[in-house]
């Protein structure tokens, strides 16, 4: 009686083929998971930067002296100038896809260099003379990631001014 110990060549080829298919499937899912994680991190960075920008603007607009310019069309201009009681004249605008804050003649970029600003508009209402409405400014902000996997987000908030008088 003849006993065969070991595998035949065909069994070996079939097992290698099945193993290689499993490796390719596992590798593909791993690469997909990494791409998804990168996209999520880009989105998080864009969102955090947008929240920071809007919060900074909102804090200063909230306590500013009444903004005298009004616009009936919304979205309005992409530049907002106002008088802050402590910091003086402040202006927000977009320059080279970055948000620029001008205080006392000094320009400062307040957005992350990895985040591109696609839109910045201000809608001002309730500040006309004889108007009994609460003055408010709506900030509309569009941001996207500057990476190859561009993630875009649109943010909007409305800030009511605290008209503080002496």
Which residues does each PLM region occupy?
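Acidic surface patches and DE-rich sequence motifs
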Residues: 3, 84, 145
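Short linear sequence signals and composition-biased patches located at protein termini or domain-edge surfaces
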Residues: 106-107, 111, 119-166
């Amino acid at each position: 009686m003849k006993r065969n110990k070991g595998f035949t060549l065909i069994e070996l080829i079939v097992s290698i083929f099945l193993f290689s298919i499993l490796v390719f499937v596992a590798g593909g899912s791993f690469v997909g998971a990494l791409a998804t994680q990168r996209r999520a991190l880009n989105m998080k960075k864009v969102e955090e930067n947008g929240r920071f920008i809007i919060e900074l603007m909102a804090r200063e607009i909230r306590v500013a002296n009444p903004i005298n310019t009004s616009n009936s069309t919304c979205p309005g201009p992409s530049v907002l100038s106002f008088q802050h009681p402590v910091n003086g004249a402040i202006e927000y605008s977009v320059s080279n896809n970055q948000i620029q804050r001008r205080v006392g003649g000094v320009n400062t970029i307040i957005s992350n260099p990895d985040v591109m600003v696609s839109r910045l508009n201000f809608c001002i209402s309730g500040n006309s003379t004889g108007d009994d409405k609460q003055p408010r400014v709506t900030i509309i902000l569009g941001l996207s990631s500057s990476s190859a996997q561009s993630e875009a987000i649109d943010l909007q908030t409305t800030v009511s001014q605290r008209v503080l008088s002496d």
